[in-house]
Amino acid sequence: MADKQRAIFQDVESQAKPAAAPGGIDRAGKGARGAIRAWIMVIFAMVALMIAVGGMTRLTDSGLSITEWKPVTGSVPPLSEEAWMAEFEKYRQIPEYQLQNKGMSLEEFKGIYWWEWGHRQLGRVIGLVWALGFFGFLAARKIPTGWTGRLLFLGGLGGLQGAIGWWMVSSGLGGEMLDVASYRLATHLGLAFIILGFAAWYIFLLGRREADLMQARRSGDTRLFGRSTGLMHLAFIQILLGALVAGIDAGRAFPTWPLMGDSFLPPDPFTITPLWRNFFEDAGLVQFVHRMVAYALFLYGAVIWWGARRGPNGHTRFAFNAMFAVMLLQVILGIMTAIKSKHSFSSCAMNVFCLSICSIFSQNQNV
């Protein structure tokens, strides 16, 4: 009996411990995370540049200089005097030329044409960079598990942006419109920042292992994450309001600060019927709302920064300090815009970028 018991214990002790089964994150394909991250960084930089070029296109009144949408053949600019005259003749048919720029010379037309052509050409290059990267990584089977849909989604947003761009331009080619519709301009700019935001988010996600991201989500400061995300959303609303200001040239109506002319409120802000249209079409009221949201955004950002400036994590403190510094810069640029009729789309890009960093760092305390 003793021998039999001894044999049983010997058998149990001799059995090796089973290896732990790998989790889903460990089993998932890693792919070329670093290469894909670098590729998205290039796209991010190009989208930021395109926002800046789009701002200059708007400021120089160049957006309606090309009256047709030719995604492929339009990549070749006029190469002869006859081709230039043909393009100029098309521009002469739209209200902007007939009511505002009548008498413009061919050389002056070339100046605005190159801005719009460059803006569209940059969009084509971004699409080409995305397509080459996506299908190249896909063919090489280097896309990490779970990332094919995300990258395809990013490209889909880019294609949609091109269509919305033409939808915006077409609004200024008929009737008595001298510029594109401000609603469509806001939609176009808003989607550009959405693309920029997703690209930034993907860049930060790809910079860390999936297991690290999971651990960071579990230990993150959800309250700080929620506040900074709310700040990012408020900044996005402010960008849309800025597009409305640019769309109807509301900034030129009251080039003074801190007052709107001689008073705090703009005179006669509700002259358009129905009432709600004043918030989108009355130059004084649109600029006033833009200013008030700017003040609220700065105060809210200052409160969040004050609470996060002594956090235990150095990366988080740095991110919030950078965000607050950019907000201070944006306030100064906003005041200069009101006084000197200048705009800065690139500073808005930096603003949203820093806010995105804050959202990520506040969630991932172990960054």
Positions of the model-derived regions?
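Membrane-interface helix-loop-helix junctions at transmembrane boundaries of multi-pass membrane enzymes
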Residues: A139-F153, W305-M323
